[in-house]
Regions:
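A nucleotide-sugar donor-handling region in carbohydrate enzymes
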Residues: 1-4, 103-178
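Conserved nucleotide-sugar phosphate-binding/catalytic loop shared by glycosyltransferases and other
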Residues: 1-36, 43
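Donor-nucleotide binding loops and adjacent catalytic segments primarily
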Residues: 7-10, 145-241
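Short N-terminal targeting/anchoring amphipathic segment
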Residues: 48-62
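A donor-sugar binding/catalytic signature common to diverse glycosyltransferases
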Residues: 58-59, 66, 81-82, 107, ...
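Short glycine/serine/threonine-rich phosphate/pyrophosphate-binding segments
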Residues: 62-69, 115
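Active-site proximal beta-strand in glycosyltransferases
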Residues: 71-85
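A conserved, positively charged/aromatic
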Residues: 88-105
C-alpha cells in the first residue's frame, strides 16, 4: 500500500499462490530499518519451517531479501542468486548482496566482471553463469502504449517533462537531509520551464525525508508536479520513450 500496490503486478502476471509476509514497519530510520530486518528474519523462520522447495531464486540486494536468505541458512534451503557480484556506490546494498551470494549455491550474473567477483567471494568457479541482465530481454519486446491513455492514467500534461528518480544515501545517512533540500531547490527552478514527474522513494533509510520535501514541492507547484508511487514496467519504459530529460 505504501509503495503503490506492487503486489498487483505479480498477480496480473498470473501467479496465483503468493505467500505474503508482513514484516516491514513504517519507521525508516536506521533503527527502524534494522528492526524491519530482524522482523523479516523472524517471519521467514516460520516460513522456512513450514515450506520446502527444490530451489529458491533470490533477486538483487534488498535488505528484505537478505533477511529472508539469512533465515533460510539453518534450514539448508538451496538458493539461486540473480545479479550477484555487482557494486553499488553510496549505498549499503553491497553488504546485503554479498551476504546473499555467500548463502547461495547457484549464481546468475550480468557481466564477466561480476562473475569474477562472485568467484572471489565464494572461492570456487563452479555454478556461476554469466547470463546478462534479465531485464534487458524486456527492451526489444517493448511496444509503445497509446500516449493519451498513459497521460490520462497518471494525470500528466501533454507537454515536455522531466523524470526524477532519487535513491536515498544509505552510507552517509545524515547527508540525506542536505541532499533532499538541494534536490527540491533544483526542481523548484525547473518548474519555471518544465513539468516534473517524480517517482517516489522506496523503503530505504530516510526515504521519508525526501517524501516530506517532495510533498511540499507538490503543494507549492501543484500544476507542475506529478507524483507516482508505482509506474510498473511497461509504463516506466514508456516514460523513458517519451522523456525530455
Amino acid at each position: 500500500k505504501n509503495h503503490g500496490y506492487t503486489l498487483s503486478a505479480i498477480e496480473e502476471d498470473g501467479f496465483e499462490k503468493i505467500h505474503q509476509i508482513d514484516a516491514l514497519g513504517t519507521d525508516d530510520s536506521q533503527k527502524g530499518i534494522s528492526i524491519s530486518y530482524a522482523n523479516t528474519i523472524l517471519k521467514f523462520a516460520d516460513f522456512w519451517q513450514n515450506n520446502s522447495f527444490d530451489l529458491v531464486c533470490c533477486l538483487g540486494d534488498r535488505f528484505e531479501m537478505s533477511a529472508a536468505v539469512q533465515a533460510s541458512i539453518p534450514f539448508g534451503v538451496k538458493l539461486a542468486h540473480i545479479h550477484g557480484g555487482e557494486t553499488t556506490l553510496g549505498a549499503i546494498d553491497n553488504v546485503y548482496r554479498h551476504q546473499i551470494t555467500l548463502a547461495s549455491q547457484l549464481h546468475f550474473v550480468s557481466t564477466l566482471d561480476y562473475k569474477k567477483k562472485v568467484e572471489e567471494l565464494t572461492g570456487t568457479l563452479e555454478n556461476i553463469y554469466d547470463v546478462g541482465a534479465l531485464s534487458l530481454d524486456n527492451i526489444p519486446n517493448f511496444q509503445p502504449i497509446e500516449k493519451m491513455s498513459f497521460l490520462e492514467a497518471f494525470q500528466i500534461k501533454n507537454e515536455d517533462y522531466v523524470l526524477v528518480t532519487f535513491h536515498p544515501e544509505t552510507v552517509a545517512v545524515d547527508s540525506n537531509i542536505t541532499y533532499a533540500k538541494q534536490m527540491i531547490a533544483a526542481l523548484a527552478e525547473l518548474t519555471k520551464m518544465l513539468n516534473i514527474v517524480i517517482t517516489m522513494p522506496n523503503a530505504d533509510t530516510l526515504g521519508s525525508v525526501y517524501r516530506k520535501q517532495i510533498y511540499q514541492l507538490k503543494k507549492t507547484h501543484p500544476g507542475k508536479i506529478v507524483l507516482v508511487e508505482n509506474f510498473g514496467k511497461v509504463n516506466y519504459f514508456y516514460l523513458y520513450y517519451q522523456i525530455l530529460i
